[in-house]
Amino acid sequence: MIKQYLLVTKPGIIFGNLISVVGGFLLAAKGIIDYPLFLATLVGVSLVVASGCVFNNYIDRDIDKKMERTKNRVLVKGLIAPSVTLIYATVLGIAGFVLLYIAANPLAMWLAVMGFVVYVGVYSLYMKRHSVYGTLIGSLSGAAPPVIGYCAVTNAFDAGALILLAIFSLWQMPHSYAIAIFRFKDYQAAGIPVLPVVKGVSVAKNHITLYILAFMIATLMLALVGYAGYKYLIVAAVVSIWWLGMALRGYKTENDSIWARKLFVFSIVAITSLSVMMSIDFSVSSASPALLTYVW
């Protein structure tokens, strides 16, 4: 039974988000790490993300059974009662928000709240099922964790936080479209209006290319503005150019599914590489006026 409660939180998604939280936190910490704050931020974000994933599993249980990838999820198979799932998700969320508020700062908590509301309230409940722009809206919630990690340290939403938001939001788009392409039949069967299904794979390829170009600019800005060092800059340039090259090869591919799967896999390599590099190659001299400083 414990295993089912763990699976419904989508551990893989939690782990992926924690990598970005670490990147944002250590970028802001600049080598001076407050370990209790670091641990509290990781646990707090984990709880909030877990809560969002459980709510998402509850909301999507009707369409999950139509998709090959999700037909064996816990709620689809009835291994946990829906009513219990709601209580579980609520407890996880409250615990996460309270921990971020007490151990980090109110700004970190409110960023988590905004990411949660966008993911559960806007994306999962409505946009995912009714709009081709659902992925775009959902990308904002996916970009929240590194910003929370960053602001847990700075207690200010400055240019660095804004660039992180841009990097991770832009990354989500080609990453998600790639999934929709190699899982095309799943999304089509479930009636989910993702871009490749609604507009076609050719249009999705154009969007993927443009988003990767924008992603490249955003990643380089983190170093050019002075938040990260030249080693980060080199890695950011290499992974962005390589990812762009993979996207361009999609115009000549004979198998869209295989190409999209490779693009998806490399997207994980790319964002992980950037998270690691911003963690270890930060710039101690960067300073930027806060766009929003939360004083409590």
Swiss-Prot record:
Q: What class of enzyme is it?
A: transferase
| Pathway where it operates | Porphyrin-containing compound metabolism; heme O biosynthesis; heme O from protoheme: step 1/1
GO MF annotations, alphabetized: protoheme IX farnesyltransferase activity
Lipid bilayer topology: Multi-pass membrane protein
The entry's cellular-component GO terms read: plasma membrane
Q: Which NCBIfam families match?
A: cyoE_ctaB, PRK04375.1-1
| Protein name (record) | Protoheme IX farnesyltransferase
Species this chain originates from = Edwardsiella ictaluri (strain 93-146)
